[in-house]
């Protein structure tokens, strides 16, 4: 019997049964619509975007986080230890608001590119494993060596690119390097 047939065949002396039936059907329809709506939501590219899990390590691209506040908010959503890839033109950044969360969550840090003097100085006492590399390939490869099972490798630069690249270009470099590494390790 369909929902509408059930309504038509309901006797007047059963109003509470009818209300209960209608309510449960409406709630079920709402639940299904909510599930469908949520499943259609896509993440915003380069904003806390999951890329892959390689050898038990999860890789996330947060290249849109080109300032301290954006990176801080990303760290608020993370509960696992992090190998943090950051860097760029740090001349305008003030990293003091990140220090506490970095001490709590970051296992190691990889500074990528040029212009990271202020970034390294800000965290050299908080992170025992702090490295500097020249490009994204080196950053991802080093981060994969530093990461342990169930860690997160997070690319969240906390500053603009020193080379004038967009966050999209840097995020794509990160994603391509991770995907290439994933492919090589699973052949």
Spell out what each predicted region is.
Residues 15-23:
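Internal alpha/beta core interface subdomains
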Residues 2-12:
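A short glycine-threonine-serine/GTX helix/turn-capping micro-motif
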Residues 10-15, 65:
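Short, conserved micro-motifs enriched in small and acidic residues
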Residues 1-2, 51:
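Local beta-strand/beta-hairpin segments that build beta-sheet-rich folds
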Residues 22-30, 36, 40-46, 50-187:
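ATP-dependent carboxylate-amine ligase
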């Amino acid at each position: 019997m369909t929902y509408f047939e059930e309504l038509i065949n309901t006797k007047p002396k059963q109003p509470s049964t009818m209300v209960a039936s209608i309510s449960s059907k409406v709630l079920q329809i709402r639940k299904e619509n909510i599930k469908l709506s949520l499943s259609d939501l896509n993440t915003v590219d380069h904003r806390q975007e999951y890329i892959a899990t390689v050898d038990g390590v999860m890789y996330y691209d947060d290249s849109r986080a080109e300032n301290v506040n954006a990176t801080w908010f990303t760290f608020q959503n993370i509960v696992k230890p992090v190998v943090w890839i950051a860097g760029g033109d740090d001349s305008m950044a003030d990293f003091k608001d990140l220090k506490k969360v970095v001490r709590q969550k970051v296992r190691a840090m990889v500074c990528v590119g040029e212009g990271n003097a202020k970034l390294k100085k800000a965290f050299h006492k908080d992170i025992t494993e702090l490295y500097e590399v020249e490009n994204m390939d080196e950053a991802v490869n080093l981060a994969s060596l530093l990461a342990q099972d169930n860690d997160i490798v997070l690319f969240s630069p906390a500053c603009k690119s020193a080379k004038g690249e967009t966050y999209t270009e840097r995020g794509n470099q990160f994603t391509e390097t991770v995907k290439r590494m994933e492919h090589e390790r699973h052949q």
